[in-house]
Amino acid sequence: QTCALPMMGFAVVPFAPGMMIIDVNIGLLFFLGMTSLAVYSVLLGGLASNNKYALLGGLRSAAQMVSYEVFMGLSLIGVVMMSGSFSLVDIVEAQTDVWFCFSQILGLIVFIIAGIAESHRLPFDLPEAEHELTAGFHTEYGGMKFAMFMLGEYLGLMLISCMIVTLFF
């Protein structure tokens, strides 16, 4: 993932009352859209390295990201139905009495698993696992280019963590 997409995803996260970059009525869909666009950076990263192993690693990572994106979206249906809105501010305000993690425990578990898979962490790091011959789609990258891929992955992990807290707690 590049750094720009997770940073754009942070734009709709309400950190405190009135403390967000932008409040849109479809903040949840914006978040899902930004995580879906990260697939292109993985594909282009594997393709741009001009290495067949990096391309195969990029294709495997992209297939994994697309497949878990469906479960991530489906796990949020209960949250949207209980809050009645796609706005993250409205979702947080709907949890003033009771958190959604109690009534939507299955959605929370599915969202956590899909978030871990989206961020390429154990046990879902198959394209970059220890038993692989190459390091996935960033085989040919080093220095600052590799650091930007890693920074994007860790920003995506932080964004998923912020969304878990925003949507369920």
Spans of features found by a protein language model:
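Selective transmembrane helix interface/packing segments
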Residues: 1-169
